[in-house]
Curated annotation (Swiss-Prot):
It comes from the Bacteria. Involved in the transposition of the insertion sequence. Keywords: DNA recombination, DNA-binding, Transposable element, Transposition. It comes from Clostridium perfringens. InterPro entries: RNaseH-like_sf (IPR012337), Transpos_IS4 (IPR047952), Transposase_11 (IPR002559). This is Transposase for insertion sequence element IS1151. GO terms for molecular function: DNA binding; transposase activity. One of its GO terms (biological process) is DNA transposition.
Length: 473
């Protein structure tokens, strides 16, 4: 058996250890005495059969429970089990699985060695909830979204690991999450920063810690270059007001041809001028510019905001800042690497379209919370299987699998997996072999000549064999 598959089987077996699950159930007071619903059955029901917990009537859920476990359960009894203790139980299992998924995927031998230990993307997914949840999860306050939820994800691209998942109300801005992110230690990382998380102090902290970043630039960001001929006082000291020259990105891009890219080195960011980086500007083609402007105006209309001319003009360019040396990433590679952010959008598409995390009707809050943690646990388990399989297939067959296809195919195994997963390593290995075979037959990414895959783009920062040795010393 492939050693990665064997390691995965062992990891899943440990994660679904029945003794550990029962201990968590007792510690959380979910199980206080022997009853018709066991901790194992409740976990199985929420994780493997829970896509409709917040959409199906209780009578259907009770009927499904009977079909799966051969236990006739009144719908009122099932409803009572969705309580504060079951929420705590599911939350603790979720935390355990988050750690397990991180541990499993980060310990796999890398198929691709790069200049960076990790390539990290931060983003969030939001969706509207029934208005009854507005006390716990307040929304924007309007009629359309009195209640909404936001799930923040730190995603590591090289392994597929969900480094962290945090749950907030829908009114929490992405930039506020930077306070939470401070507690996570930075390694030799490359962070692809979205504008929602753009804060100069945060980028400055990354730079100071030795963490690499590529970030888009906001239209109102102050950018400066050192004045080559500053004014001086008679004593020879430089006049502070003339030490730097403010630059305008839009004006710099005006003489460029469509599709042309330029780079300015030693750019100072922000009014304090404490962060120095490279600035890369690309003038977009008329076609791309028109698409951007259309989407921008539609977004303004939808949110009922005031049109800002500078922000509108900014749609004619791509502008990035990075502290990565040009010896590692050239100016023409910066946009390609930043475009890897699309991978997290694929993950969120999986969350919504396949795991239906956003399909919530009016139910009691505890039922929703059990549903949410159940979906997240299912996603953690699935991502561990999918990304381990992806690594194996890339290594053995030199082919890439499509994450969308793989996740979609994997959930077809959930009914069988739900029972085999508690039987031990042999049974888990057997079903994982079947899943791997399925991915090889039906999950391979279709070739599109006009589009590079994520793996192709990551090769831009690949370490050659002689460099691996040098970096290890």
């Amino acid at each position: 058996m492939n050693k990665k598959l064997k390691y995965l089987s062992k990891s899943i077996k440990e994660s679904f250890d029945i003794n550990e699950i029962n201990k968590i159930a007792k510690d959380s007071k979910f199980i206080q005495r022997k009853g018709s619903i066991t901790a194992k059955d409740f976990l199985m029901f929420n994780v493997f059969y829970g896509s409709d917990i917040c959409t199906a009537p209780l009578s259907q859920l009770a009927a499904k429970y009977d079909m799966i476990f051969s236990k006739q359960l009144p719908k009122q009894a099932l409803d009572k089990r969705f309580n504060k203790y079951s929420v705590e139980f599911m939350k603790e299992i979720f935390i355990k699985f988050l750690y397990s998924q991180n541990n499993t995927l980060t310990n796999l031998e890398r198929t691709l060695r790069t200049y960076f230990d990790r390539v990290i993307i931060n983003d969030s997914i939001s969706f509207t909830l029934p208005k009854e949840f507005k006390k716990k999860f307040p929304g924007s306050g309007g009629v359309a979204s009195p209640s909404s939820i936001k799930v923040q994800l730190q995603y590591e691209l090289l392994t597929g690991s969900f480094m962290n998942i945090d749950i907030f109300s829908g009114i929490k801005n992405d930039v506020e999450y930077l306070k939470t992110m401070k507690k996570y230690k930075d390694y030799k990382d490359l962070k692809l920063a979205d504008l929602g998380y753009f804060k100069i102090d945060y980028l400055k902290r990354l730079d100071k810690s030795g963490t690499a970043f590529i970030s888009k630039v906001k239209s109102n960001t102050s950018l400066y270059i050192k004045n080559p001929s500053p004014e001086k006082y008679k004593v020879g000291t430089i006049k502070k007001s003339s030490e730097y020259i403010k630059i305008d990105i839009i004006k710099l891009a005006e003489p460029l041809a469509a599709g042309e890219t330029i780079e300015l080195t030693d750019i100072y960011i922000g009014s304090k001028k404490e962060l120095k980086s490279r600035l890369i500007i690309t003038k977009l083609t008329e076609e791309n510019k028109s698409k951007r402007i259309f989407n921008h105006i539609e977004g303004i209309k939808k949110k009922r905001l005031t049109l800002n001319q500078r922000r509108l003009d900014f749609n004619s360019i791509n502008a990035y800042i990075t502290n990565v040396s040009s010896n590692i990433i050239t100016m023409n590679q910066v946009h390609e690497l930043y475009s890897l952010r699309w991978q997290i959008e694929i993950i969120f598409k999986v969350w919504k379209s396949i795991f239906k995390i956003n399909q919530v009707k009016k139910v009691k809050l505890e039922r929703f919370m059990c549903f949410l943690y159940g979906r997240l646990i299912a996603l953690l388990l699935s991502s561990t299987i999918v990304f381990t399989s992806k690594s194996i297939i890339l290594e053995v067959d030199e082919k890439e699998i499509s994450e969308l296809k793989a996740f979609g195919n994997l959930i077809q195994y959930f009914p069988k997996l739900s029972f085999e997963i508690f039987k031990g390593e042999f049974y888990i290995s057997r079903i994982l072999k079947s899943v791997l075979s399925n991915f090889k037959r039906f999950g391979i990414k279709s070739k599109k000549n006009y589009k590079k895959t994520a793996f192709n783009i990551l090769k831009l920062i690949k370490l050659e064999s002689f460099e691996v040795t040098r970096f290890a010393i």
